[in-house]
Amino acid sequence: MELMIGRVVKSHGIRGEVAIEVTTEEPEIRFAQGEVLNGRQGGKEHSLTIASVRPHQNRLLVKFKEIADRTAADSLRGTRFFAAPLDDDVDDGFYDHELEGLAVIHGEEKIGEVSGVIHGPAQSLLEVTLESGKEVLIPFVHDIVPEVDLDAGTCVITPPEGLLEL
């Protein structure tokens, strides 16, 4: 199993740096100088070596040894980087990619599908696309989402009255 650890948002400057949106809790390990990142974009795979890294506006600015200029950096836009879980990644939580696509069950009925996860400072929110096409946000807390069954591909919710109508 591989985890997505970041995504190239855009190029930065003229020397080939890229801005990376980090999706891992270990950026200091995953994006260390000298690390080789495995990226995928549009069916192509890239192996890129980090030459330098620095924080910038809640993202990382990364310079790769293989990328010489802005034009080459622009070609990386949208590249997603993946890595194997670290040994300490094993816990009772869920990875975003495990939750995305789960059928959302309320009572005995499928009402929609998890389309994404938003991580907030206090709690995470499940983005759910209802059968009607409407999107709602559901707090990912045990009282509202008491059961997640990855094997069955389901997520049972018990929302308070009115939550699905917001």
UniProtKB/Swiss-Prot annotation:
Keyword Metal-binding: no
Signal peptide segment: none
One Pfam family of this chain: RimM
GO cellular component: cytoplasm; ribosome
Predominant subcellular localization, coarse grouping: cytoplasm
Subcellular location(s) of the protein: Cytoplasm
Gene Ontology BP terms: ribosomal small subunit biogenesis; rRNA processing
Domain of life (superkingdom): Bacteria
Keyword Chaperone: yes
Transmembrane segments: none
Keywords, sorted A to Z: Chaperone, Cytoplasm, Ribosome biogenesis, rRNA processing
Gene3D superfamilies assigned to the protein according to its UniProt record, in alphabetical order: PRC-barrel domain (2.30.30.240), RimM (2.40.30.60)
SUPFAM superfamilies in alphabetical order: PRC-barrel domain (SSF50346), Translation proteins (SSF50447)
Single GO MF annotation: ribosome binding
Domain PRC barrel: 91-163
InterPro entries, A to Z: PRC_barrel-like_sf (IPR011033), PRC_RimM (IPR056792), RimM (IPR011961), RimM_N (IPR002676), RimM_N_sf (IPR036976), Transl_B-barrel_sf (IPR009000)
Subunit: Binds ribosomal protein uS19.
Assigned protein family: Belongs to the RimM family.
Domain notes: The PRC barrel domain binds ribosomal protein uS19.
HAMAP family documented for this protein: Ribosome_mat_RimM (MF_00014)
Function field: An accessory protein needed during the final step in the assembly of 30S ribosomal subunit, possibly for assembly of the head region. Essential for efficient processing of 16S rRNA. May be needed both before and after RbfA during the maturation of 16S rRNA. It has affinity for free ribosomal 30S subunits but not for 70S ribosomes.
Protein name: Ribosome maturation factor RimM
Organism (species): Corynebacterium diphtheriae (strain ATCC 700971 / NCTC 13129 / Biotype gravis)
